[in-house]
Amino acid sequence: MKAFGGYHPAVTFTYFISVLLTAMFVWNPVIQLTALLGGIMFSLMLVRKKAVLSDMGFYLPLFLLVAVTNPLFSHNGVTPLFFMNGNPVTLEAVVYGVFISVMVVGVLFWCKCDNEIMTEDKFLYLFGRIIPKMSLVLSMALRFVPMFKRQMKNVSRAQKAMGLYSQKSYVDRLRGGIRVFTAMISWSLENSMELSSSMRARGYGLHGRTNFSLFKFGARDAAVLLSGLLLFAAVLIGVGSGSIDFTFYPELGKISLSLKSLITYISFFILSFLPFFIEVKENLKWKYYISKI
């Protein structure tokens, strides 16, 4: 189910902007771990567990790469753990590398959730009248990667059905991969030109053109939007007051547990898990109604 996707596009767009801005620019371990966990839990509600595990198979090597690379190239910090080729590998650099990895993976999970909820029609609805060309480009970019992956699988299956690169040698696989990739480049260029011509023929972006939409802003949309904005405002106040500031260099700081910082942590926790709570609530409601049939 995608219960959160049933809310007004302005609500979901504002929510994702709030979470992503916090996850990208608030350098606090508690905030980053909360964002990562919230993104994972929301992803599990939106897509199949197999797809989430597949994503983790890609994110885990990325996590390790970033976490290991930073202490090898950055030697800042006052707590050396050991020396490699005469250069110190410091505790601060290791923690900073892990922190960056958590931030990157968390943002990737939230971007995936955003891609599942904010479909191209919602972007066109929100920005089609204000910035029609930019909204068209954004909607095309959002749908490009999933379409590219689906089309690549179709082309690969079609060529395998024709008997191409059926051998198991690495050279044959490489040739087949190059052939599929070449076909995909041609397909993507042709598809973008056809879409642009189609939208132009329909009068997209012309002044005075009306749009049909099924989106209506109701009371529940107002409630979720107001709740999200209040929680985001609480996070911004906490960040602005410096209550959750955390330093990595020259030595690791301490995680603040003051009243202001706790309010900030709790506010962001509720904000990042808000769609998860909504999905769980709708699932329970659905199961309850099914049990009454």
Regions found by a protein language model. Give the residues of each.
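Structural signal for the C-terminal ends of transmembrane alpha-helices
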Residues: 41-49, 117-118, 276-281
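Alpha-helical transmembrane segments and their membrane-interface exit regions
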Residues: 38-47, 62-67
